[in-house]
Amino acid sequence: MARIEGIDLPRDKRIVIGLTYIYGIGNTSAQKILAEAGVSEDVRVRDLTPDQEDKIRAVVDGYKTEGDLRREVSLNIKLLQEIGSYRGMRHRRGLPVRGQHTKNNARTRKGKKVSIAGRKK
């Protein structure tokens, strides 16, 4: 099982799909990484040679992935909250950030409805 950036890639999948298991690498990034490393997209993870694994690791090291990327995203959100921007306020209140309406929907972001006990008409 190939291990890249601390993630065990699934053995039975093609390498282009296996790379997407790493946080911060999607389909397009995976294709670019493999092209730069000179590895075919159709190779299964179990069929990679150690040399190919090393080439892929070297290319992936140039990308911001996993812990570094998660840390950067959380710091960006924290900065928005500290400077008091509208987006920061929406993050702090747990509401949608990108201008969506919240009168009817936004349940995913707002969480489960909270009933008000003892309230009758």
Swiss-Prot record:
A GO-annotated cellular component: cytosol
Record flagged with keyword Ribosomal protein: yes
Any Gene Ontology biological process: translation
One Pfam family of this chain: Ribosomal_S13
Molecular function terms, GO-annotated: rRNA binding; structural constituent of ribosome; tRNA binding
Stretches for region Disordered: 90-121
Entry-linked InterPro entries: Rbsml_uS13_C, Ribosomal_uS13, Ribosomal_uS13-like_H2TH, Ribosomal_uS13_bac-type, Ribosomal_uS13_CS
Keywords: Ribonucleoprotein, Ribosomal protein, RNA-binding, rRNA-binding, tRNA-binding
Assembly and oligomerization: Part of the 30S ribosomal subunit. Forms a loose heterodimer with protein S19. Forms two bridges to the 50S subunit in the 70S ribosome.
Record-linked NCBIfam families: uS13_bact (TIGR03631)
Entry function: Located at the top of the head of the 30S subunit, it contacts several helices of the 16S rRNA. In the 70S ribosome it contacts the 23S rRNA (bridge B1a) and protein L5 of the 50S subunit (bridge B1b), connecting the 2 subunits; these bridges are implicated in subunit movement. Contacts the tRNAs in the A and P-sites.
Family named by the database record: Belongs to the universal ribosomal protein uS13 family.
Protein name, entry field: Small ribosomal subunit protein uS13
Species assigned in the record: Lactiplantibacillus plantarum (strain ATCC BAA-793 / NCIMB 8826 / WCFS1)
Lineage per the UniProt record: Bacteria, Bacillati, Bacillota, Bacilli, Lactobacillales
Encoding gene, per UniProt annotation: rpsM
